[in-house]
Amino acid sequence: MKSAVLVAFREPGFIEENVKKLMSKGFEIIIAADEPSDEILRITRKYGLKATISDKRRGKWKALNDAVEIAEGDHIIFVDSDTRIVELGDFEEFDAVEIVKEINASSLIERLANIEYFNMFLTAKVASKFSSCLSLNGAAFGIKKGVLLKLGGFRRCINEDTELGLRLGLNGYRVGVCGRAITKAPSSFKDWLVQRERWSLGGAEVVVENLWSILKRPKLWIPHLFLFYPSIIGLVLGFTLPDSVFLKALSLILPFMFFVHFKIVSLLLLSIFELHVIRNLIAMFTSFIIWALTVIVLSKKTDYSFELKLLPIYYFIYNPLWTMLCIVALAKVSVFRLTGRELKVKGWTT
């Protein structure tokens, strides 16, 4: 038997559409809803569904665990209300599966996020080849109930999906990639920042708590680091290119060589500056070309569509911003952990 837990906060989203699709495939359906609208209650009654419903916000981890308690299936898929299942694939052959997600995008920030979701897919696919997993995307995924219970269920944290994915990887479970779902992303930059504050702090919380275990298993984090944060490639390449200590020293000394002709000193300084600029540009554009060609080829092979013209914006602006947010989040979580302060995200219940 297979169970599907459809998760909602207030609004129904695609719940009824998913109910119809999954019931036709023989799934037991369970609604896990906090502060449900009348529409969610109507859908639950109409189809005679099992449900765990709370008038107050429990926190997603608690809502999921409550649903697992009443699920009878050996395999469970979890689907957020803003996500629509298109196909599932052979998810039962794995201990857990990442369901491939695409974004039905209209705004610029959504279209850029769709490229990011392709990177998520690539990360999960490469990780599965190494029999590893660093995180799951909670919008849609599946897991064997026995595996979930053995791991102790969902834990109380900001990113319960990331934390569960890491535990799967650390304990050697087989995590596959299959199926397809359409999900939503923030349509405005302001909403994107709100989401990314939660994602980055939640991810940093998991990383800091398990740092040593992660570092000891490079196959867990190397695919994630370079595929999910591709702008790091340029940074690494920049470090590997020749960088003359002599030129650095000369650029510091030249301004004080007032006994040399003023114009000659200025031209020498300009030359050194331009050499550094050229060096950095070579690193940036070489890494971009390598990354862009790679994702274009892989997108064709996997039939995943996104706008190629947005790749430069994604690589040089969107992803570096996301990377910086993650770095700041790591610093904040580390300080809070050292000082014993509780980490909270505004508008999010744990």
Regions found by a protein language model. Give the residues of each.
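Long helical/loop segments within the catalytic core of UDP-sugar-dependent glycosyltransferases
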Residues: 62-63, 79, 85, 93-150, ...
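Short aromatic/hydrophobic "clamp" motif used to bind/position activated sugar donors
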Residues: 76
